[in-house]
């Protein structure tokens, strides 16, 4: 702010930087949303593929976000905040799912994801398996009806 320059980034959002990371921008704009899937996998270095859109989890009763660079993932209210963490990025706080919740989401959506991309992320999870909290994974799996199947796939694919 030395030069007294403030840039309007979006409606109601201003910054001292002309270019703002879309992940940070949309975390500010949609405060109740949570960074998920491809955006979160990239953030955690589980893939080197830079997502061209920001993936945001929102309450399934939320309004549709009408932006072409956002993929909105609707989640039931009772599951939305499970695994949510607040992380500081460049001085800004973002909501993002932890690695354990993302692993469960990855397994749940494995048939909707390109196989090579899925395998890359799974291989990177294998490298960090010792840092994962197994208890959290079990809790997140228990949220879904097919918990035995999900648990078996995670054991087979990652552990």
What are these language model-derived features?
Residues 9-159:
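Nucleic-acid-binding surface
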Residues 1-2, 42:
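Short polybasic/polar patches that bind polyanions
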Residues 2-10:
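A short, conserved structural fragment
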